[in-house]
Amino acid sequence: MSSIIRSTTILPANRAAITIHTEDELNLVGEVASPKGARVASILCLHPLPTHGGMMDSHILRKAAFRLPELAGIEVIRFNTRGTTSEQGTSQGTFDFGVCEKYDVEAAIEYAFSEAKVERLWVVGWSFGTDLALKYARDPRIEGLILLSPPLRSSEPEDLLFWAADGRPITALVPEFDEFLKPAEAIVRFSAIPQIEIIAVEGAKHLWVGEPSVYRVLNEITLKVSPRKYPLPTEWSEVN
C-alpha cells in the first residue's frame, strides 16, 4: 500500500552525525544521509542566513535529506556553518557575515571527498548559501552548482566571472515573488555567466513554503543530479 509523501514524511536512509574540521581549527556539526541502495550522486547543502534562522535543518534541506536518498539515490550532506545552531547542535565559532565561512565551505567539500568518499558532488545553496557557493565552492572536483533563491548579496563581479570562465553548469531557481531578487532582475544580474540556467518558479516565494514549492525544488535538484529518477513520485510504498 502506498502513502502520500507529506511534509513530515521521513523515508529510509543511512543517517550519521558528522564533525567537520576547518582550517582555522573549528568543529562544525553536520549529518550525512546516504541511500540504503546505490548512491548515484551527492549534494552538499549550504543553508540560509543564520542571523535570520537559517541552519542545516531549514525545511528544504531537511526534506531533501528525508526524501532524496530513497527516492533518487542522492546522498545529502548538511552542516551548520560557524556559530549556527540546529537540533544536531552548535558549530564552533562565530558568524562572520560570509567571510570566514570560506573555511567552512572548503572544509565541508574536503570532508565530502576525503571522508564520505563521494564520487559525484553538486553544491546546493539556498539564499545566503548561494553566495557562499558562488564565492567558495570552486573545488574542481565539484560537478556544478544549484542555487535556490539567490539574493546576490555578497557575491562580487569577479565571482561571477570565475564561473563564466570555468564553464561548469549552474542552475538558479528564482521564485516569482522572491523578496530579494526576482526572475527578471536575476537574468540581468547573472548575465555575466553564459551557461547559467535561470528557472523562474511561478507562484513561489523566497522561503519555498508549501509542499508544491518543496516538490518543485527537489524535482529540479533530481533532474540535474540524478535525472533517471526524475520526476520524483508523490507517493511511496515500503515495498519498492
Give residue spans per PLM region:
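N-terminal cap/lid segment of alpha/beta-hydrolase-fold proteins
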Residues: M1-A41
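Serine-hydrolase catalytic machinery in alpha/beta-hydrolase-like enzymes
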Residues: L26-A116
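Gly/Ala-rich beta-loop-alpha elbow adjacent to hydrolase catalytic centers
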Residues: G125-A133
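Acidic catalytic loop of the alpha/beta-hydrolase fold
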Residues: R153-S154, E176-L181, H206-L207
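Short alpha-helix in the alpha/beta-hydrolase fold that links the catalytic acid
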Residues: E158-L160, L181-S191, S213
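Short beta-strand/loop motif that positions the catalytic acidic residue
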Residues: D166-G167, A172-V174, D178
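Catalytic histidine neighborhood in serine/cysteine hydrolases
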Residues: S191-L207
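Catalytic histidine-centered segment of alpha/beta-hydrolase-like enzymes
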Residues: A204-R216
